[in-house]
């Protein structure tokens, strides 16, 4: 049996899948299987996979069940001791699996090991931004405020965690299914972090019509579920958790194609009502500057300012190296 099962859910992702698969097949660690779950795609994914000669790649086709359902299918078919997830448009550094396996082999008590993640745009170009989190060991206090496992593509999970904590909740959508899963694992197992960007997360402009209320409700479900099983001594974190969730939500209208800065301001207001102390946080200051830029320059000007800042960040990073 392979040591690692790599689960890739795919829904009409053929534009990015070849590069994603290549980043897996060129891993320095070779003892793995790839379980690609074709989640009801209509873009010829099956035909493309059939042309891959590598016997480690296995295809499962199902009717569309969403990201959680596809991941759960992958988990059910996985035979590895460790399970790593990779979204169909993200990329891995060649040493990603090797370093994570070594971490789990050397630390038998660890349930999940994650890495830093670098942000790329839709065309695969670096934005210059790297998400860095340092929390490890008992991380529940940190993860209830912020999903330190920034992307599902950075996580490698010990198989027994799913046997103990259950699998992904198919009733949750709107990008919170990861957060819910990691919270449940964090309540039972320590985490480790590899402090280097071994994953490239592809950022897309979201569609114009997003149901912000549904997204907010998904956050609410996760928070209430987490605190329902948390010891009373941790309940003081609930207000801060809601506040941080609403700061996170406030970015979503600014990242959509039809940017809605008024909705962003509404989420920001709610965040500070839940937790006034967040007013002085770096995240709230960044959000305030982004909203101000939108008000000053409009939607097109805001996008140009972001592009200018990303370019400046890339040049600074190249100079620093």
PLM feature spans:
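Glycine-rich, basic loop-to-helix element that forms the pyrophosphate-binding segment
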Residues: 62-78, 99
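Conserved nucleotide-sugar donor-binding catalytic segment
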Residues: 76, 115, 129, 133-222
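Short aromatic/hydrophobic "clamp" motif used to bind/position activated sugar donors
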Residues: 83
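C-terminal subregions of glycosyltransferases and related glycan-biosynthesis enzymes
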Residues: 203-321
């Amino acid at each position: 049996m392979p040591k690692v099962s790599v689960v890739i859910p795919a829904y009409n992702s053929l534009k990015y899948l070849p590069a994603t698969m290549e980043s897996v097949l060129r891993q320095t660690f070779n003892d793995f299987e790839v379980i690609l779950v074709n989640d009801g795609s209509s873009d010829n994914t099956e035909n493309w996979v059939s042309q891959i000669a590598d016997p480690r790649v296995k295809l499962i086709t199902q009717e569309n069940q969403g990201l959680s359902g596809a991941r759960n299918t992958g988990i059910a078919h996985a035979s590895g001791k460790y399970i790593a997830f990779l979204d169909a448009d993200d990329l891995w550094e060649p040493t990603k699996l090797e370093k994570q396996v070594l971490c789990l082999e050397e630390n038998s008590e660890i349930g999940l090991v994650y890495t830093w993640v670098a942000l790329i745009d839709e065309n695969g170009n670096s934005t210059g931004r790297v998400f860095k989190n340092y929390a490890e060991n008992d991380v529940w206090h940190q993860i209830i405020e912020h999903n330190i496992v920034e992307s599902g593509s950075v996580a490698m999970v010990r198989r027994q965690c799913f046997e103990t904590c259950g699998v992904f909740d198919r009733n949750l959508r709107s990008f919170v299914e990861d957060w819910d899963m990691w919270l449940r694992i964090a309540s039972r197992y320590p985490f480790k972090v590899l402090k280097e960007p071994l994953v490239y997360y592809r950022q897309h402009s979201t569609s114009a019509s997003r149901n912000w209320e549904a997204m907010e409700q998904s956050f609410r479900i996760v928070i209430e579920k987490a605190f329902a099983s948390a010891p009373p001594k941790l309940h003081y974190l609930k207000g801060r958790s809601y506040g941080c969730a609403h700061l996170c939500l406030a970015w979503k209208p600014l990242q959509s194609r039809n940017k809605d800065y008024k909705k962003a301001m509404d989420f920001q207001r709610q965040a500070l009502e839940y937790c006034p102390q967040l007013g002085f946080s770096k995240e709230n200051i960044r959000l305030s500057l982004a909203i101000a830029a939108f008000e000053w320059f409009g939607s097109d000007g805001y996008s140009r300012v972001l592009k200018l800042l990303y370019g400046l960040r890339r040049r600074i990073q190249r100079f620093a190296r």
